[in-house]
Design a protein with these regions (language model features):
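One-carbon transfer enzymes
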Residues: 1-205
Length: 205
């Protein structure tokens, strides 16, 4: 399975995917790294692994449609079959979602459908989780549709919140399980073990 990874930041989830591929745990190949930030750490990781990189930002285009066309041109050129959003902080254009329906997944640092939606990313998520008083948090891998964090949930794993947790300590715990479940979800897709029916998605054995 040829995967295009989209990332905006340091690229730790991107790195986790690469580790899984290198270890023979994920039968896939990363064909391109696309980022909306020219200085994203993920770009350096891609270059170190001789993976093609593309900087594509809405600021470079006159409309969302123009950005979508540019993204789709890159995906076609690189023969990308699947898209993994690994810390990508921008909404995917609707036309890209339509062309890759049920072939885009995102990793979110909380247990959706709680603590998701527009603007809920990074430290903000963990601050909101702790402020709510819930006793568990976690990570969610979900399919991407045209609403923020509303696509069918595929995989989740929890962490326990303790009384002295801070946004930073909770983020570290959640990030650890993100690195575990994201490659696992991609492996299920690569092996054809994902079933999707309406708003429900699950992995078969």
């Amino acid at each position: 399975m040829n995967i295009a990874v989209f990332a905006s930041g340091h690229g730790s989830n991107f790195q986790a995917i690469l580790h899984a591929i290198d270890a023979g745990l994920l039968p896939a190949r990363i064909v391109v790294l696309i980022s909306n930030k020219s200085d994203a750490g993920a770009i350096e990781i891609a270059r170190a692994h001789n993976i093609s990189t593309q900087h594509l930002s809405q600021k470079m285009f006159s409309s969302e449609e123009a950005l979508a066309d540019a993204i789709l041109e890159v995906l076609e050129k690189e023969h990308a079959e699947f898209i993994a959003l690994a810390g990508y902080m921008k909404k995917i254009p609707a036309h890209v979602i339509q062309q890759y329906q049920n072939r885009i997944v995102n990793i979110h640092p909380a247990l959706l459908p709680s603590f998701g939606g527009e603007g809920m990313y990074g430290r903000r998520v963990h601050e909101s989780v702790l402020a709510s008083g819930v006793k568990v948090s976690g990570a969610t891998v979900h399919l991407v549709d045209e609403e923020y964090d509303r696509g069918p949930i595929l995989l989740q794993k929890t962490v326990t919140i303790v009384s002295d947790d801070t946004p930073d300590s909770l983020a570290a715990k959640v990030l650890k399980i993100e690195h575990e479940i994201f490659p696992r979800a991609l492996k299920a897709f690569a092996e054809g073990r994902v079933k999707i029916e309406g708003r429900k998605a699950w992995i078969t054995s």
